[in-house]
């Protein structure tokens, strides 16, 4: 029976839907190589106890997808005996006798099993039969196809604009160990025992997820002629060109040697959901030719740039941060596909230990890096204890302060009210965002020459609407940070201003609150850039307002608080009469923000 996307029901909570959707959308035109996310090792999160069962793997991967992990490092083992890519590090032999014992089998009884047999016991939690292979307990059927079935079901389950997120796979290829010599390195796999065409990783991926994959061939074709690729789509899907190099030939055709498409281009224009690269490849598989798979899978390390990082005891970074106070030139800031090399995990689960990890992930994201979890959290895998994993991935949220965006507190007609419908950067909250009344007067954040990291502060305080039209001087425009690193550059620029203008410790809001171009005036909880007349993209097309169940369950699955003390709440009143309030709401649901 094929595995499915089947996360724990307890993970579903819609309170963070606005946060995740708004961050996805504000970064929607940034080339994907500059957008940070959260990465995780499947080996650590799902098999840290050395148990490789199908039932547990289905639940674990489903939970990780549900709580918002978008990049997965996966270890695959080629078993010549089985002619399959398996998840267990040891090949399960087909020619040996299988001795089934109960879970209560004594060590003496086990020791009496004759050599040349394999012991199998039912797993205590799932009842699935697992084979004892040295330090490992493995299902005889957990393989690459099983994982891809979970991804396939997930993609089908989240197929509306509101809940689409691009995923990334980094595949590490190994040779499975011989079950008769588990403690020894795997032998070299001769050419005749390597995968045939139908068993190559690219062939399997193409067969299961081909319609979702954006591969090297797609990138090469798009880069060669931007006039016929990234430039011919909706303006809102085009990548921000200041992030990459553009060349033009004598015919006026533009190309790029280093550009990447934006998330909106991949998801909405190209209708793709997945990018795959090879990570490491064991020398025992040295004859496995990766070059023939370049249609589907990127070469080793193509989607990864590992940044060495040193962290202090409080979770701040001693070294490795990509913010450079001496330059705003993006060509000198190597943030493309930037990944942290390690997240140190304390042994014991406590409020203090989790706060340290959370603070570290927050700082890595602010410094322009994707955080990578390569260890099992506090000794518990995500199929059994998913809470720490969901808390950690939400720590990579970079924009809103805790409890934000706050919902309007008034029962008046919020369709005509500007209460809590515009965003400010609050320097008293470490540069995170919160909501404010749009009629309040503040200075505005002005982007210089459309450059990602160059900012100016407007001279006069104005309302949000007036700020969009009149605040910013020539060669600048009212704007909003679109990534964690852009946000850091803006907040650091503001902090460099005279204390007469900016003072995070001041009780005067004018000195620590700055307008950014982000509002939900058109549709409550639908946050958009473009001034007070910008419209919500999810209410203009009836086709985008289908499948409310998907919105409530799939989006909600990537939701929880960053710290244990935060209480989550979502208010749904689908039957509210609209005689007094003509409020427009995404998908008919009233997302009231994240309570503080």
Where are these regions (language model features)?
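Residues within well-ordered beta-strands of beta-sheet-rich folds
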Residues: 73, 168-172, 445-447, 517
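Extracellular, disulfide-bonded carbohydrate-recognition/adhesion ectodomains
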Residues: 202-596
């Amino acid at each position: 029976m094929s595995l499915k996307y089947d996360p724990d029901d307890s993970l579903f909570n819609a309170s963070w839907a606005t946060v995740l959707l708004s961050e996805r959308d504000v970064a929607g035109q940034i080339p994907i190589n500059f957008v940070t996310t959260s990465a995780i090792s499947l080996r650590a999160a799902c098999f840290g106890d050395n148990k490789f069962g199908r039932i547990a793997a289905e639940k674990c991967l489903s939970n990780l997808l549900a709580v918002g992990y978008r990049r997965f490092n996966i270890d695959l083992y080629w078993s010549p005996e089985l002619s399959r890519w398996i998840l267990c590090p040891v090949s399960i032999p087909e020619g040996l006798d299988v001795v089934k014992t109960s879970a209560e089998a004594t060590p003496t009884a086990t020791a009496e099993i004759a050599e040349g047999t394999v012991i199998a016991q039912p797993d205590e939690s799932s009842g699935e039969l697992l084979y004892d292979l040295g330090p490992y307990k493995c299902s005889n059927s957990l393989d690459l196809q099983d994982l891809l079935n979970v991804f396939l079901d997930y993609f089908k389950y989240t197929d509306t604009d509101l809940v689409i997120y691009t995923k990334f796979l980094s595949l590490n290829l190994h040779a499975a160990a011989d079950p008769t010599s588990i403690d020894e390195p795997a032998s070299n796999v001769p050419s005749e025992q390597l995968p045939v065409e139908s068993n190559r990783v690219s062939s399997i991926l193409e067969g299961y997820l081909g319609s979702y994959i954006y591969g090297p061939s797609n990138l090469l074709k798009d880069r060669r002629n931007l006039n016929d690729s990234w430039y011919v789509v909706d303006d809102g899907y085009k990548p921000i060109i200041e992030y990459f190099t553009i060349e033009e030939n004598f015919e006026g055709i533009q190309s790029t040697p280093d550009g990447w498409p934006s998330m909106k281009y991949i998801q909405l224009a190209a209708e793709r959901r997945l990018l795959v690269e090879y990570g490491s490849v064991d020398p025992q598989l040295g004859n496995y030719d990766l070059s023939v798979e370049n249609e589907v899978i990127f070469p080793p390390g193509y989607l990864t740039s590992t940044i060495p990082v040193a962290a202090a005891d409080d979770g701040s970074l001693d070294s490795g941060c990509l913010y450079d106070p001496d330059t705003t030139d993006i060509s000198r800031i190597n943030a493309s596909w930037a990944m942290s090399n390690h997240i140190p995990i304390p042994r014991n689960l406590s409020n203090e230990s989790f706060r340290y990890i959370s603070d570290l992930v927050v700082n890595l994201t602010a410094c322009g890096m994707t955080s990578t979890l390569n260890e099992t959290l506090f000794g518990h895998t995500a199929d059994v204890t998913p809470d720490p994993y969901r808390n950690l991935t939400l720590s990579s949220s970079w924009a809103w302060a805790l409890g934000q965006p706050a919902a309007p507190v008034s029962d008046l007609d919020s369709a005509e009210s500007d209460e809590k419908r515009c965003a400010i950067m609050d320097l008293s909250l470490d540069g995170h965002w919160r909501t404010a009344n749009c009629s309040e007067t503040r200075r505005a954040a002005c982007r210089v020459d459309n450059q990602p990291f160059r900012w100016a502060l407007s001279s006069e305080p104005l309302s949000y609407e007036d700020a969009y039209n009149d605040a910013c001087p020539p060669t600048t425009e009212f704007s909003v940070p679109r990534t964690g690193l852009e946000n850091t550059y803006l907040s650091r620029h503001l902090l460099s201003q005279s204390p007469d203008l900016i003072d995070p410790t001041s009780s005067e809001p004018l000195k620590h609150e700055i307008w950014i171009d982000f509002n939900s005036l058109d549709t409550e909880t639908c946050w958009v850039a473009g001034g007070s007349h910008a419209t919500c993209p999810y209410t203009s097309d009836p086709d985008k307002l289908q499948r409310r169940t998907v919105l409530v369950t799939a989006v909600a699955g990537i939701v929880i608080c960053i710290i244990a003390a935060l209480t989550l709440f979502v208010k749904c009143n689908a039957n509210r009469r609209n005689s007094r309030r003509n409020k427009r709401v995404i998908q008919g649901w009233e997302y009231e923000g994240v309570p503080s």
